[in-house]
């Protein structure tokens, strides 16, 4: 059975842009993610799926610029939940080297920050 594996790293950084579109919000982030290096990624938020308008789906796509000079790309998706001006995300990604990860991420729209924890998937 597949389960969440060990904690790989924590990450923190900034939102570099936010666009409110007719189909949803698009957020670009730049974070420092330890062994993954500098990670640049785009989050695209779908419409809410609950009556309260507090949760919905999202996709993620990005690239890691590792300290050793290598790069990895990744794609994935998950869910988000609003908490005031903050948004909690949980997503699964697949990296170009075959790694699968699970992340819990916190966005603060007022502070324009992104932070969270990345776990391996077994």
Spell out what each predicted region is:
Residues 1-122:
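Beta-strand-enriched cores of mature, soluble protein domains
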